[in-house]
Amino acid sequence: MQFNFITIFPNLIKPYFDDSILSRAIKSSIIKLNFINPRDFSADKHLKVDDYMIAGGAGLLMKAQPVFDAIDSLDSTHIIYLTPAGKKFTQNDAKRLSKFENITFICGRYEGIDERIIEEKVNEVFCIGDFIMTGGELGALCMCDAITRNLNGVLGNPNSLDIESFEYGMLESPSFTKPNVYNGLSVISAFLKGNHGKINALKNNMALCKTRFFRPDLYQKLRSPKKQKEKR
């Protein structure tokens, strides 16, 4: 899969891929990266990519021309724009988007991008949460990371995907490692007795409790009549 990042700050993104799982994915040719700077396409003699908003408004906006031309320089691709106005990105989106061969992230700056770019060029609009950031680069990295983990050959143990949070609509159960006792704090005794049926039942119950406490919104969806019917 190829990921394209349209950004005026490519050096904010590149270091994230220098280590760990994503670095291995690049070395294994599972993913490829391409960075496109709108300044390289600016028709302005000073290579400006921003301007004041028509009809007023605070701050500057990324101009249509450089971004249009940056997009047109790419082959066929699925284009995503990161903005607080977008739909919230979820694990289901990550799994779905992992089926694409080529994805492009438009990383906005200032007050965003000219609306005509969204209307004419963008396939999907996402946000990663109800908060404001200085640009779309971190959001694009979050999405790229989540999507990449769903590609074949990226994770050492592909079964890890089956037991992660959100896979079954709830958070993952609490996890422990050795030693069994640390600073007087013990691992749950049932986890040490080898009864896998009881362990799985306990983990499921703990996952439900964790979801109810930390993510009541997810818990309500689990308890909805539609979800209950699906379980049957």
Swiss-Prot record:
Keywords: Cytoplasm, Methyltransferase, S-adenosyl-L-methionine, Transferase, tRNA processing
Matches recorded under Pfam families: tRNA_m1G_MT
EC number, as in UniProt: 2.1.1.228
Localization of this protein: Cytoplasm
GO cellular component: cytosol
Function statement: Specifically methylates guanosine-37 in various tRNAs.
Record HAMAP family: TrmD
Protein name: tRNA (guanine-N(1)-)-methyltransferase
Organism of derivation: Campylobacter fetus subsp. fetus (strain 82-40)
Species classification: Bacteria, Pseudomonadati, Campylobacterota, Epsilonproteobacteria, Campylobacterales
